[in-house]
Amino acid sequence: MTATRAPRAARGRVPLDQRGFDFSRPDDIVCGVDEAGRGPLAGPVVAAAVILDPAQPIEGLDDSKALSAKKRDALYDLIVARSRAYCVASASVDEIDTLNILHATMLAMKRAVEGLSLMPTLAQIDGNRCPTLMVRAEAIVSGDALVPSISAASILAKVTRDRMLVELHARHPVYGFDVHAGYGTAKHLAALREHGPCEAHRRSFAPVRAALDLIR
């Protein structure tokens, strides 16, 4: 595993013994990997892995958070249609509560890479940590804004998770999952206090535990 350094403003914590290495090779099959949903109080964490096709470039790829919902949806369709391979995977709320959110995120990323129909030789991961994989892995801080395949993965993960939360909203409309995607907005926290958590809430997260205490 290695970590590539982004420009100074984008740097995060990277272990000293992982800086300055570059394991890429000219003949590598590279997949980009990113996640969506580490911070929310409800719903799964979703990860995606994407191997882009250089013969079918996709214009406009960027960090999913920097794009409008309409632009993300349009790029989602292009990524699915033009990529050499892609896979979207997740870790459940139960897995998040059992493992903790970091390890559940690594699990979702591992599932996404291992679910690709084409085996990569190098996985480039957004952030400063890599899951344990059967292929070489490189962590890239702010990779979702720097590496097109990671940008593509961030879009697939974000769009997929947002759609999951819209479906969850249909079952539990009192929380407003279709608006905040499970994040701890003021309205979401107020609904938690009033109604208590549903089965999709992460009980290992402090605001959810606090809401549980109120109804006991």
Swiss-Prot record:
Enzyme class: hydrolase
Ranges annotated as spanning the membrane: none
Annotated RNase H type-2 domain residues: 28-216
Textual note on the cofactor: Manganese or magnesium. Binds 1 divalent metal ion per monomer in the absence of substrate. May bind a second metal ion after substrate binding.
Binding site for a divalent metal cation: D34, E35, D126
Entry EC number(s): 3.1.26.4
Catalytic reaction annotation: Endonucleolytic cleavage to 5'-phosphomonoester
Protein's UniProt name: Ribonuclease HII
Source organism of this protein record: Burkholderia vietnamiensis (strain G4 / LMG 22486) (Burkholderia cepacia (strain R1808))
Organism taxonomic ancestry: Bacteria, Pseudomonadati, Pseudomonadota, Betaproteobacteria, Burkholderiales
